[in-house]
Amino acid sequence: MSYEPKVSDFLALTKKEEILPKALTRLKTVSISTKDVISVKESESLCDIDLLVNVPLDKYRYVGVLGVVFTGEWLVPDFVKGGVTVSVIDKRLENSKECIIGTYRAAAKDRRFQFKLVPNYFVSVADAKRKPWQVHVRIQNLKIEAGWQPLALEVVSVAMVTNNVVVKGLREKVIAVNDPNVEGFEGVVDDFVDSVAAFKAIDSFRKKKKRIGGRDVNSNKYRYRPERYAGPDSLQYKEENGLQHHELESVPVFRSDVGRAHSDA
């Protein structure tokens, strides 16, 4: 039983991806690999599997496996007892519990079985060329001599290749701007910067009260702002406006409408 997958079974295109050219969307191309048949000869086996056959990798940076369909055909009579467990593994991960992408169990009496996995994650093209995926097949309670082939597996995958996998970054937000004007792009950049947690944390930290002279004071209160505070009362000393006591002296007054400094004795 051969399976001919449909892209729509694994991937739902947005309206933008359907209308816009490939260069303007994250989706670049979708390829269906040729089938790969695995003949199971032992009760337990672990073998590499190429999920990216005929997928063009050289022109892209990342590849994602959107879906994998396994079709199994038992090569024994349907009254035979026993079953099989098929697991797909990402061999890059060392933890045995975390490396399993998906597992399926089927009984020999079912004769044929089929299941679909949706890994839905990307790997770099450099990693993909090293074939990071494996299939672990374990036949249980099937009384058959060693060396015979009781099971055949056909594997078909749907993959997507792209040069950009960051979907929430500034680049994607800028591309999404419909009106190509400076103000629109500046607004997107400002909104993105304001949304980053690190910027918020720094801004909040700077606004906190600082300790001066052993007590909490607002540092903004003592910042020199001549245009706002210079005036008739500038020469009058007030204890609450100073950090230290000084004798009265001439104070330079800056006026923005004149453009130069004046001294009032």
Curated annotation (Swiss-Prot):
Which Gene Ontology cellular component terms are annotated?
Answer: host cell cytoplasm; host cell plasmodesma; host cytoskeleton
Intracellular or extracellular location(s): Host cytoplasm, Host cytoskeleton; Host cell junction, Host plasmodesma
The alphabetical list of record keywords is: Host cell junction, Host cytoplasm, Host cytoskeleton, RNA-binding, Transport, Viral movement protein
Spans annotated as Disordered: 223-265
Any GO molecular function: RNA binding
Q: Which GO terms describe its biological process?
A: transport of virus in host, cell to cell
Q: Where is the composition biased (Basic and acidic residues)?
A: 224-249
Q: Which InterPro entries match?
A: TMV_movement, Viral_movement
Write down the Pfam families for this protein, in alphabetical order: MP
Domain of life (superkingdom): Viruses
In UniProt terms, what function does this protein have? Transports viral genome to neighboring plant cells directly through plasmosdesmata, without any budding. The movement protein allows efficient cell to cell propagation, by bypassing the host cell wall barrier. Forms a ribonucleoprotein complex with viral RNA. Binds microtubules and modulates microtubule stability. Can bind double-stranded DNA.
Q: Indicate the family of this protein.
A: Belongs to the tobamovirus movement protein family.
Question: Which protein is depicted?
Answer: Movement protein
Q: Which organism is it from?
A: Youcai mosaic virus
